[in-house]
Amino acid sequence: QADIDTLWENMDVIDCFATDHAPHTLEEKDSQKPPPGFPGLETALPLLLTAASEGRFTVDDIIEKMYTAPKKIFHIPDQAETWVEVDENAQYEIRAEEMYSRCGWTPFEGWQVKGRVTRVVLRGKDVYKDGEVLAEKGYGKDIRA
């Protein structure tokens, strides 16, 4: 808990937020040589929006640390017609059975969160909307090219 408290107390010196998404199954994690990481992509923004709703920081801080700063640090070019829409007031419980990840579990099972991604537009095309993935496999693109 001391480490967690220290992180919250020092948010002002953290340049950016990043997340791992290593969708290993529980069977893989329970092996002699478990792979590192855990599924985190689907829960990152709802967890951060929850923290913002609790007054730990602002939505502008999230934008700065998840979009603006990483873009600057890693020299990521502008992505035309690309954005994420959220419902900051949506409240729900994180449940692995409702997630898209192949691993079937989350370390945040049962956590109550406030804030849900409702739409993702990538290069002008809806790729996620109202809980449904609309993009076909392979629609992603190397943004460094």
Residue positions per predicted region:
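A short acidic, glycine-rich active-site loop
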Residues: 1-2, 37-39, 107-113
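Histidine/acidic residue-rich metal-binding segments in metalloenzymes
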Residues: 1-17
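His/Asp/Glu-enriched, well-ordered alpha-helical/loop segment
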Residues: 12-86
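Amphipathic, soluble alpha/beta structural segments
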Residues: 27-37, 134-145
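C-terminal cap of metal-dependent C-N hydrolases
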Residues: 80-143
